[in-house]
Every structure is written in structure tokens, then in C-alpha cells.
Amino acid sequence: PAQEAHQVAVAAFREAQVQYLNNQPWQTIKNTLTHNGYRYTNTQCPAADMKIGAQDIFPNAYQGKGVCSSDTTNTQHATNLWMSTLSVNENGKDKTLFCGIRHGVLSPYHVKDPILRQVGAENRAREVLTAALFSQPALLTKALQDEVVSLRLVSVGLLTTSTIVGNEDAMVQDQMRAWQSLTQPGNVIHLNIRNKEGELRTVKIKPEIAAFNTGVNELTLKLGLGHQASDNYNIGALHQLLGHDLRPEAPPGGWVGEWLAQHPDNHAVVNTLVRQIKDIWNSKLHHTDGNEPYKFAQRLAILAHEIGAVPAWNCKSGKDRTGMQDAEIKREVISLHQKATLTPLASLPDSDGQEIFQKVLLNSGNLEIQKQNTGGAGNKVLKNLPPEVLNLSYQRRIGDANIWQLVKGLSSLVTS
């Protein structure tokens, strides 16, 4: 009885904590950083602030609130859903350099009933698609004018698909099933979106989703867990994105090939990313740290943006691995904007790159998102494990012990 009472008390406390965190105001986070005379703005817009009019666009309105990463049984809303944007001020105007959608895993993984859990995962997937449509204003306008619009999404899961440790393999299965259920060939799905008058409108979209998963933690990159299960998903997604011939010298097919045919003058960055992604895949470089834990995930997201698809990425909670992916993307996009070339594969940032990374880690909104979800700012990706050989390359990538500690913050003290 004492043990039972303790379990009930713990569950009640956790539920109260979830309600408290969900019911805080969830508001847009905006930070700026300057580098070599350019001023960059990082904007993290939560679902509650995705608005055309006075209310958010979702049929089940957020009303200024949110869904924190500990809310693992929510079958109505996606967890920790944000639109992440990087822009630069050029000639007095803001120019978007990158925009994508970040979230927690689609699986409401503490729901025991498998049917209800799958319904919840599909509801969450619909919200991510709604956010993706919101991130493409021209498409959204067409959809609200009763046009059937095609929406391409590159989903990059960052979970460890191991059946030995943790339960992330089952979560990824739920997520992949949810994406699959919404993307049958020729399938038109209906989403309800609140327009600027606050009325619910049914829009029709044809979603195409290239769904990847690539583990980025020590279990995957140091102990080799989960590669086979993830790569079984990744091969089909790569064929969608790049076509069936994945030899480095082969011209890209798939979505990239279509985009290149329509944009023949703007292909240097796209072709370099394609070559790097093929090299990663063919040499299995995403199976190890190799100075760059997020090498595959980051390039997939940047490539998606470059070809006009919507990049989306997630881990379990949507705050730590997801936050590091967000920072790695923005570091590279700022570096590309400054130097007009991409960083070579499997390399540590140079001193200028480290300076950009440090500024991004502190000014990208990720510390604030972590605090919004747990009450404490800090990224769990950064840790010092006793056998040095198990540590990821983040101390060397960041290059400053004080900033490493600031970004790590309170992460080891918070739950979820």
C-alpha cells in the first residue's frame, strides 16, 4: 500500500507539473545576433502564435497555451510544436535564410491502447502538416481559396531505433505509420484551418512526405544501436528525395531532380548538399560521430529548404536533440551566407565557425524552449561521460568550455 500511495503521489505531481507548464503563456521567442557586420534574427514561433487573424489556425485552438514535452498522453495536439526561422537584414529588408517545423515525437507513447495511440499520432501528424502549410504563405493562401495544393515535407526523426535500450523504436514505428496513413498515393487530405475572420475552413492538400530517422546520441554513434532499423526507413525516403541512383556521380532524380530542372541557374548549393548526403549514405558516415554528430540530419533539413520543401525534425521531447539540430542548421546557414560555401563533410568548425556556433547556441531561442518545457534552461545533449571515448564531439565543436557549460545549463537536473 505504501508503494502504491507513493506511485499515485508521483503521478499526481507529474500531472500537476504538466498542467502548469502547458498553461503558461507560450509566446514567440525572438533573438538577434551579429557576425561580421550582418544582423541575424532567430524566431521560434509556437503553435499558439501561428495565426492568420486574432486566433491560432488550429481547429482545436491552443488559446495562447502549449503542450510541453512531458505531456506524453496528449492525443489531440502535437508536442512542443514550433516554427523555427532564421532571417538576415539586408538593405533594410528581412530576408529568410531558413524556415522549418520542429516538434516532439508524433507518438503519444504513454497511451497504452494501441488504437487510441495511433489515432493520437495521426492527429499530431495533421497538426505538423498544418504548421508546415502555415510556413508556406503562398501555398496557404491558395489552399484557403479552395485550390488543392501539394505539400512536400522532409521529416527527420532524431531517435534511437533500438529495441535494447529505451522505447524509441516503438515511438518511431508509431510516427512512420502516422506519416504513411496521410500519404497514400494520390491521397487528398482535408485539414481544418482557422482563417483571418476566425472561421474554420476546410483546405485540401496532397501531402508527400520523405520520412527519415537518424540517431544522433551516444547509443547510436558510439555503441552502434539502431542503425539497421533507421536505415530501412531512410532508403525509401532517399529515393523520394534524390531518386533511385544513389551513386555520387549520378545526377539527382526525385524531388531534387525536379527542382533542378525548374531552377537550372541556382544549383551549386543543392548539388553540393546532394553529393555530401550521398557520401554520408554510401560510406555510412551517419553511423558514427566523425566530428559531426548531426551531419546527415542537418544536411537533409537544409536541402529540403533549398528545394522549396518544408523541413521538419523531431526527437522524443522536441527540445534537446531537436534543439541541437536547430542550432547546427543555423550555424551552417549563417556560415553559408557569410562564405557562400558549405562546410566540408566530417569537419570541426574553424575558429570563425565556432564563434558563429557559440552565438547561435546562446541566441537561437533553444534555451528558452527548454525552460518553457521543463522550468530549467539547458541542453541534455551536452554531457561528460566517465569513459571519455563515449563523449560526442561537442566540446571540440563549440570550442569554449564556459559556453559549453552555459548551454548544458540545468539539463542534468530536470526530468523529461
UniProtKB/Swiss-Prot annotation:
GO terms for cellular component: extracellular region. Belongs to the phosphatase IpgD/SopB family. It is an enzyme of class 3 (hydrolase). It comes from the Bacteria. It is found in: Secreted. The keyword Nucleus does not apply. Contains the consensus sequence Cys-X(5)-Arg characteristic of Mg-independent phosphatases. Pfam families: IpgD (PF05925). Converts phosphatidylinositol 3,4,5-trisphosphate (PtdIns 3,4,5-P3) to PtdIns 3-P and prevents the transition of PtdIns 3-P to PtdIns 3,5-P2. It is one of the known effectors injected by Salmonella into the host cell and is required for invasion and for an efficient generation and maintenance of Salmonella-containing vacuole (SVC). Alteration of the phosphoinositide composition of the plasma membrane causes membrane ruffling and actin cytoskeleton rearrangements. NCBIfam families: PRK15378.1. Keywords: Hydrolase, Secreted, Virulence. It comes from Salmonella bongori. InterPro entries: IpgD/SopB. One of its GO terms (molecular function) is phosphatase activity. Its EC number is 3.1.3.-. This is Inositol phosphate phosphatase SopB. A motif (CX5R motif) lies at residues 315-321. The active site is at C315.
